[in-house]
Amino acid sequence: MSCEFSLKTFDELTSVDLYHILKARSQVFVVEQNCAYQDIDEVDFDCLHLVAYKNEKLIGYCRIIAPNSNKSKLKAAKSHNSAATVEGTTPSIGRVLILPEYRGDGLARQIMTQAIKYCRKKYGKKPIAISAQTYLIRFYESLGFTPYSEFYLEDGIEHVDMVLSLRKKVKAKNQRSSSTKILNFLLLVLALLFIAGLIYLMV
């Protein structure tokens, strides 16, 4: 599905932008999931808000939380495990949603790809954390995320912490050196066979 993306700080959001974002979050996370929880939090002030639009209508959304933000510090303070520590020192992506009528067309992957791309540009080589609902583990794994916590309940819904680390690239130099060694060995064998053939002909 083709759509347009907008990335804004909280202060750059218009009142209309904010209305549609909060409406969508309430529709998906409160009404659809039948989960009464406090969606509007003070974390929004420090986030970047990524919105997917089609014909000027919000159809998808997520927010990017900076490393060491208030939310990250709060989570780390509440827990002593390594998962909270990782999330507290890295950027994270949250409140990922697609409105029901636009699901199944790859839009969630597009939004996550855009969010990851921005995190890499803004925060460099830091890992990227998410708190994923467990039924979406395979989707996030397909983007490179791996679980790093036990399952836990958050607002009555099962979640797991996941992280996207930079993949180590195999150095082309090592690949070339292996190929060179094989090629040199084959040339040596051919040279020996050639010399053996000459000796045989001379005798």
Go through the PLM ranges and name each one.
Residues 1-57:
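Short amphipathic alpha-helix that is part of the acyltransferase structural core
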Residues 1-16, 171, 179-199:
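Conserved N-terminal entry element of GNAT/NAT acetyltransferase domains
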Residues 35-38, 47-51, 61, 95, ...:
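Short hydrophobic/aromatic beta-strand element in the GNAT-like acyltransferase core
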Residues 51, 57-67, 72-82, 92-97:
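Conserved beta-strand in the GNAT
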Residues 98, 104-117:
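Conserved acetyl-CoA-binding loop-helix of GNAT-fold acetyltransferases
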Residues 112, 119-133:
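Conserved GNAT acetyl-CoA-binding A-motif
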Residues 129-131, 141, 146-161:
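Conserved catalytic-core motifs of GNAT/GCN5-like acyltransferases
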Residues 153-186:
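C-terminal "cap" of GNAT-fold acetyltransferases
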